[in-house]
Amino acid sequence: MEKGVEKTQIIDYDGNVIEDLKEWMIDNKLNDLGFSYNVIAVLGSQSSGKSTLLNNLFKTSFDVMNTKQGHSQTTKGLWLSYDKFDDETNNSSSFFKLKKKNKPTLILDVEGTDSKERGDNRLTFEHRSALFCLALADCVIVNLWYHSLGNFTASNYGLLKTVMEVNLELFQQEKNSPKTILLFTVRDWFEEFAPIEVVRNKILDEYINKIWKEMKKPKEAEKLNINNFFIIEVVGLSHGIIKKEDFLKDVNNLRDKWINNLRPSKYSRNIPSDGFAQYCNNIWNTIVKQSQLDIPSQKEMLSTFRCQEIKNNVINNINKEIKEKSIESHNKVIENFKEWAEKNIIQKCLDDYFKDASRYKENICLRTSQELLDYLFTQLQAIVDNNLQYIQRTLCTKFFNELSNMYKICTIEKNTFSFSRDSNLKTVKDNNKNTSHEDIKRDLLNNNQDKCVHLWSNFLYNADKLEYFTFCNFYENYEKSNIEIKTNMKNDDNLKNDDNLKNDAHNNITTHQFNYKPTLSVLSTSIYKDSNRIRNIQCGILLNKTRQTIKNSFKNMDTYLLTTKNTEEYWNNTVQLVLKLQDNINTHLTKCFINLKGTNHNNLNIYNDDMMYNNDDMVFNNNDDDDNNNNNNNNNYYYYNKNDDANLSKDENYNNKFSFSLTNEKGIFQNINNNNEGSDEICYTNALKKIDLIKNKQVYKSTINEDINNKLQNKKYIHELKNYYLDEIMDVLKNKLDEISENLATIIIQRFESVFNYDEYEQPRQWRDISMAELKKIFLKSKNYAFLIIDILQKNIKVELIDDYLPNNFIKDEIIEKGKIKAKRRIQEICRDAQYIQETGSKMSLKNVPVVFWIILLLFGWNEILFFIRMFFKLNVILPLFFAAAFIVSTFVYNGNTQALSYINKIIFYMAKNSYNFFKHIQAISNPPPKNVQKQE
């Protein structure tokens, strides 16, 4: 089809639909009319002048019969043209210009009835075309001759009956169905024959009413008359050849009547112009299939098709922008996402969609608009996910850094615990009645050790507080992604029933809430892992400091080993030391171990009483200063101000009146030695509960400190902790005893010397004044005292508490024998020295050799020294040894480091060169040339 052609065939002679009607309407700018157009069709006998009438009435160019070539079928099938009434618009007043602008009429020229060319098959096509015209047209022109009135066939009586039956069939199912204008054009009419009113009455009485009475009508239509379905108009037209001027005048009058009076203000079938082509296609296909032509169903079908088509066009137009933004969101956070999504995506797409789709059935239009929104929300969800994932990673890093920085002082603090004074925790407990909370905190933070203990004692509280701030920050950022949609909530039930939409019926604003739960799950799991990672580190530091403290306490055991004389006394002293350490750890560090090692059991509670809200903060009443609350200061409430900075690592002045529950009964912080299954689900469930509190602006009540205090009162739990402390103490004690066993010889020697070398007054013994018999007596006494330590360490008695960890005779026999041999050897040396002093009056030593002796030795041995040096250089012994040593060092120390090896080689060759020169110099000095050679020179 050529562009701009004013007519087109829509149904061919064989009854097939021509598929290019939509393109024709687009080419002729008929696609964007909305409802501002009309449709008129003409029915009548073949060669009755239908096309001629339409060409004169609407300025169309339908083919007309050439009478000089004889009567024949001219119009085959159904043809469509249009008239925009441009001439009338230009000649009318400004008011009518505005009224008539862009309101054309589509003209449907139908193949004539009673065609001899179709023969017996004509009735089928006539019925189909009549049904088609009535389904489409605001006005149906019935073209007949005046002289045929009274005839059955020529007057189109059968056609008229078909039209009326079909109209009743079409529109009886549709409520508020539009009335079809039935315009009878009586051709070749003369006023002299009969006034037009007479002709009108004849048509009404002998045709319309008679047919209506004869028709089989449904019950709901039996009491109705023809005026409920049709608007009857009768127009007489003069003879087109004999009185051509009068004919043209009558046609112009009819044209004016159509423009100003007859035509409806909008298309009565309520089919937008952009869906007219598809509607025609659906109607004709339904008629051809001999299916029941249900106009409401056809309209729904068209509405569904067109709304889907419009939706897809809108999606195709916006996909590129969404895709570009989605790619961008992989690299950075999309700033002003809410504004961009609302204006550039949602509102723009809805405006483009409703511009055309609003002309179709409302329920289908709104349902499809929800499908459009669902698609857009799905695409935007990917961008929101990328934004939230970036925020999640940032918040996880921030959480880890802040919690790590908060406990950084505990990592760098290397001093062991001092149990010589009351612990800071006990001080808090004892002074709570007389000292303000701020004064207590100021005292607690006087030194790093107290800070560490205080931080460890509140690890769960600190982690939970930081976690809550993190969730608040996450939800605040998430809310910036939610989109507000302006919609007519009165009609849009689909939007009302959407779980992701929050409706504000007063302002007709719907807020779409994107899904944040997958990202929240990742965030909660990451916080759980980071918290436990830091918790494990701090627990390790606490254990190491505790073990080092225990180890330092056992240092005095070395000194006690030198003086102890009784096995029972030694081990009783050890038991007392163990019990003291156990009690000190239990008194000072139990709360730390509960926070860092023990399993936490807490319930999440929601506190709703005595609190007030405004739009920015969650505010609550908390009477911390009341006397009634002094003994119950662990029931703490929390509120979040979105303007607060969550940088808790810098906040050293937090207090216990703000506390948070971190877990359900299973606990978010499980025992560090257990990997409990389902921990991710537990974290996610608790995160959802906290988000619900934040969303609903409910106050958060914690029972962490209360539960910890209950545990401190639980005898069974404390007993288990004490056993754990005892295990740690005994591990250190075992290591200490192993160390003592390895140094058994040294201890024996020290015990021997403490008795052998010193008298009862701890004065050094003067061996010159002691007789040999007395020396032997002292030796035996010292030896027995020294070797007594073996029996003491072997623990051959029953020792309560320690027997569960250390068996009797726990030192191996080979270690004892080895220590004895080494100790005996040294003891004998000490005894020989004493004997020598006793005999000579002084101790054997090189210091006793006179200096003169060394000078004489050097003078007499000078030749031997030079001979020894010359021998080494002559045999080249020094250089090979030096090279071998250098090679070994370079191989073991700098293996693989070629640069270091090159430096070593340079140094070796330099030293070798100088050593060789030195060797030549020594040879020259040692072997002077003979005197006769010197004289010859």
Swiss-Prot record:
A molecular function GO annotation: GTP binding
Q: Where are the transmembrane segments?
A: 849-869, 873-893
Q: Where in the cell is it found?
A: Endoplasmic reticulum membrane
- Write down the membrane topology: Multi-pass membrane protein
Coiled-coil residue windows: 319-339, 725-750
**Keywords on this record?**
Coiled coil, Endoplasmic reticulum, GTP-binding, Hydrolase, Membrane, Nucleotide-binding, Transmembrane, Transmembrane helix
Q: Which EC number(s) does the record attach to this protein?
A: 3.6.5.-
Residues assigned to the Cytoplasmic compartment are 1-848, 894-937
GO CC, alphabetical: endoplasmic reticulum; endoplasmic reticulum membrane
| Keyword Nucleotide-binding appears in the UniProt entry | yes
Per the record, ranges on the Lumenal side are: 870-872
Q: Which residues form the GB1/RHD3-type G domain?
A: 34-280
The reply to whether Zinc-finger figures as a keyword in the UniProt entry is: no
State where GTP binds: 44-51
- What family is it from? Belongs to the TRAFAC class dynamin-like GTPase superfamily. GB1/RHD3 GTPase family. RHD3 subfamily.
HAMAP family for this protein: Sey1
Protein name (database record): Protein SEY1 homolog
